[in-house]
């Protein structure tokens, strides 16, 4: 019996979407933007000390191989020929820092994740050396001096990890964000791997001049970073190298396919949402929450706690676009915390059911400042609090308050963005894994008091990476001309409460935020010493701990 003929669907484009919580590989039809198949693998996070967050770079790389292999198998089962995959794009969690040995291909330390707080004392020491405080760094990079960005993570590795120090001295060390590590590995690694990054990821290191689009010598000297370990900076859409056979990839799947698109995850989502015009904005709900507004070819510097960053540069000879960004550290991560740390839910999907049971937080407010507060406060001394508890409060109210917290944080970012841009958004385009939660989307519309618009195909981050890869010179299978872009169907959520109620809830939230600030001294994450305990009387600490224990047992329904 003759084998079934493989389906011909026109040129296909793959996308690696490597996030904080998971890795995925997705394949799209370049003519219709239809998602044909994908595979996902969850990624572990390690917390070796209070405030430290790490991941294993080899586990991340292996997850990419697994996702590519499984997706190709699924395409085969659908009778789709994988030889039609003409390009691959990469989207990645930004700022997360990796240093590896270019001779062995081995990471020299775990990846230090963007959420990590260990560098707070490093930040404080550096800030005292800056003339005019943060303006020296911000004027060049668009970023405040913060634990969030790669430069201080790399400085910590150079100061504290002997393997890194030795590799730098012996000219064996390479630095990169996750995109650099993946592209180097996928294009051959120790056998000619390409050491590069794109402008969007480079702009999150605090070492990159967003005006000249080059590594900044003054910044590298200030942070004490040797420039020879930095990757080459390329545009977001060009051929970086070709996929090479790996022992981890069966039968050399996708051997020779160009890797030709690369964007940090939030820039990729901006492209995937087709926010190509000045003033268009999107909000992505993932581990964190990130609101980006395209400001065109102009750098707009915020007066209200937002970041200025590179949005994209879709080709070597194409112009650069910039964005204003509001970053929230904890969004989907709070759901994971309720599941893994408190056991209030057994799966992430369960939170919608719990919240729906009560339809209100009953005056309970949750500020999930587990890693301090990012935009618009940039306050590392903040810590998470749950307040407004009564004897009536149960786990359903806590679940509802957690969802509200994501929405309130987005409201704070949007308010800051409206003040900076001067033109309030008439609606908010959203994407990311959490947007499948309809209660969250309705809450967001209520709290913003504007419509929330969600694309029917939620994989906009991967789509953006695929678009950049397919549009690259030398690939040319995906047109980014406005008339050629596929129309996207949308689901719309309208506000269902009045403006007065929305404002009352928001103002109460802001009171809760103020209570979370100044909770800890900022030396503890680096030393591993929870110094806040030292500042509390012992009796108060014991009594408050007992109250929290009893409250947690009550909320969980334990007798």
Swiss-Prot record:
GO terms for molecular function: ATP binding; glycerol kinase activity; histone binding; metal ion binding. Sn-glycerol 3-phosphate binds at residues 20, 94-95, 148, 265. Pathway: Polyol metabolism; glycerol degradation via glycerol kinase pathway; sn-glycerol 3-phosphate from glycerol: step 1/1. One of its GO terms (cellular component) is cytosol. It is an enzyme of class 2 (transferase). CDD domains: ASKHA_NBD_FGGY_GK1-3-like. Pfam families: FGGY_C, FGGY_N. Glycerol binds at residues 94-95, 148, 265-266. Beta-D-fructose 1,6-bisphosphate binds at residue 252. Belongs to the FGGY kinase family. This is Glycerol kinase. It comes from Rattus norvegicus (Rat).
